[in-house]
């Protein structure tokens, strides 16, 4: 094992995560229908600052992300600063790393803390699958640009006369990889076939996810980290995630047909994460700054790793690649972890990554490592359920996982936790967090 790389500032401070909060996550076109991601981001950051009693001018930087970009607000981070009463002098910029976007936001703020350019910052992400950038055809787009440059009415009419009815149809956002044309579900089907994952195994994991998430809510474990949200017309509050099946039964999953490979597939809407709206954020500080303000951190960022692999085959193996690297940088092994939280984009993807982590052959032949990362202990794995149950607002999931894991570590008396996710483009992310 190579030498661990401690995440500390120039003054020797650890990177503290002092607060974390999220909105409830809502299925597409339900409670947050019509609420753009920027407003969800303002909602969660404003509430988090109000709850924390941290003066607004203490926050020197805000790094935020969204995956489904809205052209009218390309820098969501700056709009959140301007819309939440924070100091106008707060530095703010936006990031995007597909489903690992808020992992990237956290890493960026941590790097600013380590460089000494700031002492406190906010990281997070928001996405709306209900407010989408509906585009136009390439032909219509080109015609509109040319018409804007035309000098006479006759020139404009001539340009528009070339359009056909099909050119006027709206173009929804692409759901496939730009480079391959494959949908995420197609990749999940690939992985199920590559790793011999059955429909029964996928349905069982999805059922477990919903059961554990429902239990977590029932026992009140999530109430401190999820705000009550109101959406227009502001009559009914949303207090909990509305995707969780509180009375999940395994038989219900077996009724659904495959969603991607209709004839031979095993990936269904029930064993996949749904399109979701929501936002999540965390406040990071140097350890000494937290002490100055009298704040007790939720925990500390011990290490992180980002990886990238080919997109043509099994591209959602990011956790299997990034986890050993994050563990190595933290000076830990899988056995040292108290909790493991893996993003459940699809049950097939999750199960494939678990197989790879335990595989000696994968370690040797693919990763070039002498031994497997290790077999994941189910009693440590996604103990409060995962994204299949909670939902997945793309840019918000990482911040949800970090906050949720730190709270659960504290309930268990401390320890180390792994949070890890796959992402579009063959990307992977993993972070080791620590609570005392």
Curated annotation (Swiss-Prot):
For this record, an example GO cellular component is: cytosol
- Which CDD domains does the record match to this protein? thiolase
**Which residues does the Swiss-Prot or TrEMBL record annotate as the active site?**
99 (acyl-thioester intermediate), 392 (proton acceptor), 422 (proton acceptor)
Q: Where's it found, cell-wise?
A: Cytoplasm
**Annotated metabolic or biological route of this protein:** Lipid metabolism; fatty acid beta-oxidation
Main enzyme class = transferase
Q: What does this protein do?
A: Catalyzes the final step of fatty acid oxidation in which acetyl-CoA is released and the CoA ester of a fatty acid two carbons shorter is formed.
User: Which HAMAP family does this UniProt record tie to the protein?
Assistant: FadI (MF_01618)
What family is this?
Belongs to the thiolase-like superfamily. Thiolase family.
Q: What is this protein called?
A: 3-ketoacyl-CoA thiolase
């Amino acid at each position: 094992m190579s030498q661990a790389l401690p995440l500390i500032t120039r003054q020797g401070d650890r990177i503290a995560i002092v607060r974390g909060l999220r909105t409830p996550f809502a299925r597409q076109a339900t409670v947050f229908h019509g609420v753009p991601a920027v407003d969800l981001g303002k909602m969660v950051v404003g509430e988090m600052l109000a709850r924390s009693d941290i003066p607004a001018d203490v926050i020197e930087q805000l790094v935020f992300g969204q995956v489904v970009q809205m052209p009218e607000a390309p820098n969501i981070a700056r709009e959140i600063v301007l819309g939440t009463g924070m100091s106008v002098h707060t530095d703010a910029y936006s990031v995007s790393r597909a489903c690992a976007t808020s992992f990237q936001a956290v890493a960026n703020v941590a790097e600013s803390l380590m460089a000494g350019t700031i002492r406190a910052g906010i990281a997070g992400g928001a996405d709306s699958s209900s407010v989408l950038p509906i585009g136009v055809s390439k032909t219509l787009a080109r015609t509109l640009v040319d018409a804007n440059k035309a000098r006479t009415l006759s020139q404009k009419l001539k340009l528009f006369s070339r359009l056909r009815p099909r050119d006027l149809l709206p173009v929804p956002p692409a759901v496939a990889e730009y480079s391959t044309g494959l949908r995420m579900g197609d990749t999940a089907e690939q992985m199920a076939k590559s790793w011999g994952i059955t429909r029964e195994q996928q349905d069982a994991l999805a059922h477990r996810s919903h059961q554990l998430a429902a239990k977590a809510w029932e026992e009140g474990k999530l109430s401190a980290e999820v705000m009550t949200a109101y959406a227009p017309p502001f009559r009914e509050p949303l207090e909990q995630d509305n995707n969780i099946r509180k009375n999940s039964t395994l038989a219900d999953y077996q009724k659904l047909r495959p969603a991607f490979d209709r004839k031979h597939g095993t990936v269904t809407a029930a064993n996949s994460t749904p399109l979701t709206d929501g936002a999540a954020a965390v406040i990071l500080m140097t350890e000494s700054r937290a002490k100055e303000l009298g704040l007790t951190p939720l925990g500390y960022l011990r290490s992180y790793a980002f990886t990238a692999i080919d997109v043509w085959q099994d591209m959602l193996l990011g956790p299997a690649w990034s986890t050993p690297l994050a563990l190595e940088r933290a000076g830990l092994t899988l056995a040292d972890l108290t909790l493991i939280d893996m993003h459940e984009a699809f049950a097939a993807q999750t199960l494939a990554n678990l197989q790879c982590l335990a595989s000696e052959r994968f370690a040797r032949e693919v990763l070039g490592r002498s031994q497997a990362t290790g077999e994941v202990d189910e009693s440590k794995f996604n103990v409060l359920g995962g994204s299949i149950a909670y939902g997945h607002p793309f840019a918000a999931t990482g911040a949800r996982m970090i906050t949720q894991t730190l709270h659960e570590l504290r309930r268990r008396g401390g320890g180390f936790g792994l949070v890890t996710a796959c992402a579009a483009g063959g990307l992977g992310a993993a972070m080791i967090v620590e609570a005392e």
